[in-house]
Amino acid sequence: MRRSHLLATVACATLACAPLAANAQFAPAGSGGSPTSSVPGPGNGSGNSFEPTENTPAAKSRFSGPSPYAPQAPGVNAANLPDIGSMDPNDVPQMAPQQSASPASGDWAAYGHDDSQMRYSPLSEITPQNADQLKVAFVYHTGSYPRPGQTNKWAAETTPIKVGDGLYMCSAQNDIMKIDPATGKEIWRHNINEKYEAIPYTAACKGVTYFTSSQVPEGQPCHNRILEGTLDMRLIAVDAATGNLCEGFGNGGQVNLMQGLGESVPGFVSMTTPPPVVNGVVVVNHEVLDGQRRWAPSGVIRGYDAESGKFLWAWDVNRPNDHSQPTGNNHYSRGTPNSWAAMTGDNALGLVYVPTGNSASDYYSALRSPEENKVSSAVVALDVKTGSPRWVFQTVHKDVWDYDIGSQATLMDMPGQDGQPVPALIMPTKRGQTFVLDRRDGKPILPVEERPAPSPGVIPGDPRSPTQPWSTGMPALRVPDLKETDMWGMSPIDQLFCRIKFRRANYTGEFTPPSVDKPWIEYPGYNGGSDWGSVSYDPQSGILIANWNITPMYDQLVTRKKADELGLMPIDDPNYKPGGGGAEGNGAMDGTPYGIVVTPFWDQYTGMMCNRPPYGMITAIDMKHGQKVLWQHPLGTARANGPWGLPTGLPWEIGTPNNGGSVVTAGGVVFIAAATDNQIRAIDEHTGKVVWSAVLPGGGQANPMTYEANGHQYVAIMAGGHHFMMTPVSDQLVVYALPDHKG
């Protein structure tokens, strides 16, 4: 599913929104192969044994798109780039470690600071005692704005990186910039010239990757380079010093990522996350627009030589033993799980950790292959030398709730039974279950239990897994299952309306199966728990910071006839019109017996959620002393939210929907925006007290970062807004510092 889907839901639920289509689904990471799963129990490979074929009735769609294994028609190539050849993986030289592996203390050299993706900085100039003195040091305008009438697909989500003398970032539509980290002056800009039609769910670029070549001599162009994946499916390399394309990379500095994907249309597939480089291999994933058709473009994961841009390998779920690039009229297998979340590289183990989502058509699983059932909604560790899975850990079995993993894995060490550190991985999920795994083999370090779940389900031929995994060794980032007495409203009439909705729906807890006879309540919901902001971790104190959502959904499968009556159709249907079942709201799920209707569980008249507040929380967990909750409180005030879409201006901390993550520093400060009240906060890491806040010019739905320039600490947040969160749009990167250090 998509990254921010639930945000909008929550925003309306909490704070009054005009009626809004609330499902912005995207499918996350492709997972595949036949590795063993580290979680016991059904669903990890014992799924249904159906093998899709071109002649399967349910697989036929009213639009004659490609079958899952059929030859491809010419694929969409938004960049008009020629295809390039492949390289034998054995010919790839061992690369020098990237700068992100051990950045200078004042740098922020990767999306999550460094290769561990802890979102921790060793800087300590800003403390809980002086944070209230923070002032705006400078504002940088990206110049990237939606055109009139196009704010419904806009969310920058950008986190800059800082290496040496430059702050590097991308705009919502993928222009790449280098700016002076002390003054905000633009040093260079590389324009991508991306078309609006290429935007899928939303215009977003979470960040770029810094890579140092071991083959280009220091001082020569493209010794240091910036890598970016684009919405129109290009992998681009530019010189970090000048912004010029690296001519020796791909085709004149660009690689066509549509190669091998088969039939598609602009906006169906896209890249929004910075690709990790692991031992000289740049690994790319992509999102596939949710809710379209069963045989959507593949969710394949691919590796390319970071020096030359040549293809190395592919992990294609339904071709587990074939890592080659399709040639001629062939293509990667269609409809497989894709990955839209940021991946994490591990140079020491030679692995990349891929968070995966569902196969295409999130809410119906009868057409999924056994290989797909093994690796959907999972963490898959791929060997970057071969592209083969080393291990798989599944967080939901046979997922039909859109509980794809939107978070990036965080790497840290946990004490082992012999006292020696164990290389660990923290994987937050939308369910609010946080799994802590041994990243060498994927086995749980903290206890995980398989618990009974509602089974077999009510949809013919689509049984549910009888058990689901629960991370009992970590505090759950969720509230208990809903009850009718939890229904809430601004008046007794509102509450009664919500109680009636509750009674009319199927609801037996978290894994209530989808139904076609009446709605079912999905809770925590596809925007519940942790999403793409992930978590931050302080390795010195052992404190983990997590922000999360409480946003139920009200869903219902509809027959194919009803879906047609509703005008639901996939984006690649010749008759498709915007609003006819795109990324948000209802989905056609063409090629299956059903469409899907997805709405927030709310009072559509006031725009308020039916469950009582809070709708967003922030939690600190002590990972060194029994995984205890140190503090927890609502995140976000009512100042910009209210019934009927009217801001109340009230400073009450009601806990709003939030998206975007946090940063924690050696100074003991947590920085976070994320909430729909359009503020950035500094929080005392040890007490949870908010010690400073500032109103942003737009929604802060991005991960902040902090860095040092000229001996002083700065904090940066992209206040670009988010259409799903219904927050104001701006093009401003806002940078703060203590008063003596303004640019």
UniProtKB/Swiss-Prot annotation:
Keyword tags: Oxidoreductase, Secreted, Signal
Cofactors that this protein relies on: pyrroloquinoline quinone
One Gene Ontology MF term: quinoprotein glucose dehydrogenase activity
Region of interest (Disordered), ranges: 27-115, 445-474
Enzyme class: oxidoreductase
Cited function: Catalyzes the oxidation of glycerol to glycerone. Also acts, more slowly, on a number of other polyols including D-sorbitol, D-arabinitol, D-mannitol, meso-erythritol, adonitol and propylene glycol.
Name of the protein described by the UniProt record: Glycerol dehydrogenase large subunit
Lineage, uppermost ranks: Bacteria, Pseudomonadati, Pseudomonadota, Alphaproteobacteria, Acetobacterales
Gene expressing this chain: sldA
